[in-house]
């Protein structure tokens, strides 16, 4: 039996060896075709190989037979597939791909939908060739600076002729574009949906032309529009008022001329007004009965009182409200907003330390706004009375920030730690808290993930260490001085010598990594630089005194 098995294995090995020798001959035949041309006979046996054929790619053996170079797979890809690949690349990679061949250059230009250009006066010479290559642009950004002459009306209209499918337009620092340029541009680009202007030279006529021509406009942002003066005409509503969802006005001298547009935008969802002069109470009173779909309101440094807040409270669907440095707003206006806007989720208040918004308004917020998830109080002085009401009633409160408050101490912080169960992020800045309040966070707020403490002199590194031991997964970002800062008065002669501030020691105590903020780095660097300069000044003064005493003794 063993002899039979051995003879059988020996025959099998012999067959395998014969096959290997035959296949080697076929490989030699494939690798050295020049020998066959000299009359050398080829092997009769040739191993059959299964060839793969793709419905998209042709048979590679037929096209590459006898070729020494590897087959180019990408050449057989359709333009649509290559365009999809290019869309997933970065701008730098797209530039490199455009240098490969003319076909890639054409496809790269066709798949570019966003184009950002430096809008100088010499751009007009390259507009035809530039937009012939990039003929599928839907988002266009034109930027210029004060040092150079910007793009003119003729060049601006020339661009619109070649970009009729444009949906987004952003102009920054283009004072040479006038009302005529905007009118000509909007005649050719009627599909605009998002428009943003900053530091441009056109005025009311250009804005009205935009609103009357681009009927599908959804977002409008205007900043420092120089053509709108004190005696400007009214803007809007226009045909685009029905489709507008976002309006943002920044740093306008006569922003009240947009009142017809605001009152005519029935579907307006987001309203942002930043640092615009003039009385806004009348504007909001005209808007209150006509616009009811507003969800988000941002108001910063504008002249508005409780009358304006009362008018805005008619929009019962408001979920986000930012009141930043509006000193004429008081607890009365905030209470009316809280009573009528019960869906409020985010509330940011910067009281500018005027003490006009405090416990009374915040208690009303706690009473009606149960869905509150984010609360930011800057320059407001809440006490335990209002904070306890908020953390007890607003059970979904996840983010809380208390900055620049003189009344938020350890008592208030202990109340937050005890009753704010859903809190995930806490920020305390420039408040009179100590290590006792920080220790209380270790026993409360079970869902807390991140704590940020800045410019709180009573908090030391020891308190942060103890918090880390109790809550290992908690990220703590601490910016506390090692030694108490000596306060000094500043008189006519400048800062006194004893008013030396020591640089704070930045301590980050996470078990999970956390990047420190750039502002804290810059402030710490400035403090170190000031301390070193003062130390050098003192050393120089001592050297001078020593040299004088030596000269006198001699």
Curated annotation (Swiss-Prot):
GO terms for molecular function: ubiquitin-protein transferase activity. This is Putative F-box/LRR-repeat protein 8. Keywords: Leucine-rich repeat, Repeat. The keyword Zinc does not apply. Residues 71-117 form the F-box domain. PROSITE patterns: FBOX. Gene3D superfamilies: 1.20.1280.50, Ribonuclease Inhibitor (3.80.10.10). It comes from Arabidopsis thaliana (Mouse-ear cress). It comes from the Eukaryota. The lineage of its organism: Eukaryota, Viridiplantae, Streptophyta, Embryophyta, Tracheophyta. Pfam families: F-box-like, LRR_6. The gene is FBL8. The keyword Repeat applies. LRR repeats lie at residues 119-144, 148-173, 174-199, 205-224, 250-275, 301-325, 326-351, 354-379, 383-404, 405-428, 430-455, 456-480.
